[in-house]
Amino acid sequence: MALTKAEMAEHLFETLGINKRVAKEMVESFFEEIRGALESGEQVKLSGFGNFDLRDKNQRPGRNPKTGEDIPISARRVVTFRPGQKLKTRVEAANTGK
């Protein structure tokens, strides 16, 4: 099961007592800030959680799986996420029953 933006908004509604529309707008605004920063080429650092980084990948050779034909895979920029140590520790503890 996955945590959705709707569930995050519902949690804000239940814990903070704000109305559902405002909670949904807060969640959307949070993710829009992250998107905007990444689109501008900025790294996003969320203390205690992790970092969203941009990596430039060079062009490389590839193969069409249907035809076997060699084709170039174009250069591109990708988003990567590196979890912080606190997040790693909490996830590990939750999965080992500590």
UniProtKB/Swiss-Prot annotation:
Q: Where does the UniProt annotation place the signal sequence? A: none
This protein's record includes keyword Transcription = yes
Q: Which domain of life is it from?
A: Bacteria
| Annotated region described as Disordered, given as residue ranges | 49-71
Q: Which GO terms describe its molecular function?
A: DNA binding; structural constituent of chromatin
Kindly state a single biological-process term from the GO annotations of this entry: regulation of translation
Task: Give the UniProt keywords, A-Z.
Answer: DNA recombination, DNA-binding, Transcription, Transcription regulation, Translation regulation
**What Pfam families does the database record attribute to this sequence?**
Bac_DNA_binding
CDD domains hit by this protein:
IHF_A
UniProt xrefs under SUPFAM superfamilies: IHF-like DNA-binding proteins
Cellular component annotations (GO), alphabetically ordered: cytosol
What is the role of the protein in this entry?
Answer: This protein is one of the two subunits of integration host factor, a specific DNA-binding protein that functions in genetic recombination as well as in transcriptional and translational control.
Subunit structure comment from the entry: Heterodimer of an alpha and a beta chain.
Give the protein family: Belongs to the bacterial histone-like protein family.
Protein's name in the database:
Integration host factor subunit alpha
Organism expressing this protein natively: Shewanella oneidensis (strain ATCC 700550 / JCM 31522 / CIP 106686 / LMG 19005 / NCIMB 14063 / MR-1)
Highest classification ranks of the organism: Bacteria, Pseudomonadati, Pseudomonadota, Gammaproteobacteria, Alteromonadales
- In the UniProt record, the gene name given for this protein reads ihfA
